[in-house]
Amino acid sequence: MDFRIGQGYDVHQLVPGRPLIIGGVTIPYERGLLGHSDADVLLHAITDALFGAAALGDIGRHFSDTDAAFKGADSRVLLRECAARVKAAGFTIQNVDSTVIAQAPKLAPHIDGMRANIAADLGLPLDRVNVKAKTNEKLGYLGRGDGIEAQAAALLVKEGA
């Protein structure tokens, strides 16, 4: 069997005046993530992991942050399109594991909603999608609350291999 593992990463700055959307869930908070799209750091990391596993480049190659068509884009739409492109390249998504690093707000109450959104968008059973939340123990820019980071891993299998 032809298995492929991809790794994804994203980080966005926290700023006032923007909604905080992580994993397709709008989280009540006084700041949100700055970005060309909705800046969903988790979905961007997962999208990168999927494209990487399929050797299809990265999120910027497919959904450029200089393209006006993606201004304010819903990252769930981008994730669904990514999944379609990965499938068109002959791959089946097996599972996704991810970590969000944020000093605040507390993300635990929102994890189930994030997992449900990701599973729905990728057409996966819920038990094949994992989201973890960590702090940075008040160290560095993440610990100061200047931004939020996400990391993801994805496993694909080549159809017919």
Swiss-Prot record:
Q: Which GO terms describe its molecular function?
A: 2-C-methyl-D-erythritol 2,4-cyclodiphosphate synthase activity; metal ion binding
Which residues of this protein are annotated with the site description Transition state stabilizer? 36, 135
The family line of this record is: Belongs to the IspF family.
The free-text cofactor remark is: Binds 1 divalent metal cation per subunit.
Q: Where does a divalent metal cation bind?
A: 10, 12, 44
**Which NCBIfam families does its entry note?**
ispF (TIGR00151)
Under what name is this protein listed? Answer: 2-C-methyl-D-erythritol 2,4-cyclodiphosphate synthase
Q: Which InterPro entries match?
A: MECDP_synthase, MECDP_synthase_CS, MECDP_synthase_sf
Q: Which gene encodes it?
A: ispF
**Record's keyword annotation contains Membrane:** no
Listed binding positions for 4-CDP-2-C-methyl-D-erythritol 2-phosphate are 10-12, 36-37, 58-60, 63-67, 144
Which cofactors does this protein require?
a divalent metal cation
Pathway recorded for this protein: Isoprenoid biosynthesis; isopentenyl diphosphate biosynthesis via DXP pathway; isopentenyl diphosphate from 1-deoxy-D-xylulose 5-phosphate: step 4/6
The reactions it catalyses are:
4-CDP-2-C-methyl-D-erythritol 2-phosphate = 2-C-methyl-D-erythritol 2,4-cyclic diphosphate + CMP
